[in-house]
């Protein structure tokens, strides 16, 4: 669809569009980013995810050129831009506030960057209208920002950013101001637009659902360092430590003691006084402490009689109906509370558990994630 679809056609094959090497940054003597290394590939949707204060926005601002790294190097398409000012980098940013000029029309907002670059007048109108068509707002060209909805303003901000043909588009928590329904819609539209444009998107958020639903790849940060780098599925299903596991969705953490090894893939452990088999290939010996992690949707509840003692036993203490799912809290005999999420089937008489009911908590072998015992996470 015209020029905008080929925005990213000139690049070095096989090399990352952005490479951060040994990046460090401190504010007022406090280290915010410490020796960070990161490659960002051409045409990917990368999300930098982490809690407030983890340094994710600082990384974005250093890529954009709004902050200068104290140490390290930033390469953009194999060119060193560490000391290059923001306006000379082929990188554009969509801010949380969108930063639209209220006195300008939509057309003039999108055209602003082109005029600043002294693009010939004959090129400006077709490029602006192409960008507006790309975000499906060409008919809004003569309106002012206050006449647009939040979602429309967000799309105009994106059109203004992509019309300059950036190599990379940076988005700083740019969906957080939208209501839930609109945010879900924009997640889908952003990913679709990114595929259509072929531009590398780097998206910063603290919202795990946004990261999982939009990204090709997720970087999870804590205290200025990368905790895990992987696909959404890898981050969710195979967290490398307790911080990542707990930050990405709900997780149940069982304390386990090693009994013995069964084969090269499986070991026998004691969980809540019950002998269980889990998958764990690292070296381990009898008595070693481990942590067995299971998502609520990976657990099952089996109703048992009060006289029965099978599986990890507990009593249902709370239930929450969420339409498609029924979430139950089970208090185990040790006092630990476990969250279980089951698909709600109104025709299944056993799914709607009673408060106080005795149940056994089970799971399918190999669905668990097993980690070395972390005292601090």
UniProtKB/Swiss-Prot annotation:
Assembly, per entry: The complex is composed of two ATP-binding proteins (PotA), two transmembrane proteins (PotB and PotC) and a solute-binding protein (PotD).
A GO term, aspect molecular function: ATP hydrolysis activity
A GO cellular component entry from the record: ATP-binding cassette (ABC) transporter complex
Family according to the record: Belongs to the ABC transporter superfamily. Spermidine/putrescine importer (TC 3.A.1.11.1) family.
Membrane topology: Peripheral membrane protein
CDD domains: ABC_PotA_N
Organismal lineage: Bacteria, Pseudomonadati, Pseudomonadota, Gammaproteobacteria, Vibrionales
Keyword ATP-binding: yes
Keyword check for Cell inner membrane: yes
Key words, A-Z: ATP-binding, Cell inner membrane, Cell membrane, Membrane, Nucleotide-binding, Translocase, Transport
Protein task: Part of the ABC transporter complex PotABCD involved in spermidine/putrescine import. Responsible for energy coupling to the transport system.
Superkingdom classification of source: Bacteria
Main location per the UniProt record: membrane
UniProt domain ABC transporter: residue ranges: 18-248
Annotated Pfam families: ABC_tran (PF00005), TOBE_2 (PF08402)
Classification via InterPro entries: AAA+_ATPase, ABC_SmlMolc_Importer, ABC_transporter-like_ATP-bd, ABC_transporter-like_CS, Mo/tungstate-bd_C_term_dom, P-loop_NTPase, PotA-like, PotA_ATP-bd
Cell compartments where the protein resides: Cell inner membrane
Organism, as annotated: Vibrio cholerae serotype O1 (strain ATCC 39315 / El Tor Inaba N16961)
The reaction(s) this protein catalyses: ATP + H2O + polyamine-[polyamine-binding protein]Side 1 = ADP + phosphate + polyamineSide 2 + [polyamine-binding protein]Side 1
Name of the protein in question: Spermidine/putrescine import ATP-binding protein PotA
EC number: 7.6.2.11
Annotated positions binding ATP: 50-57
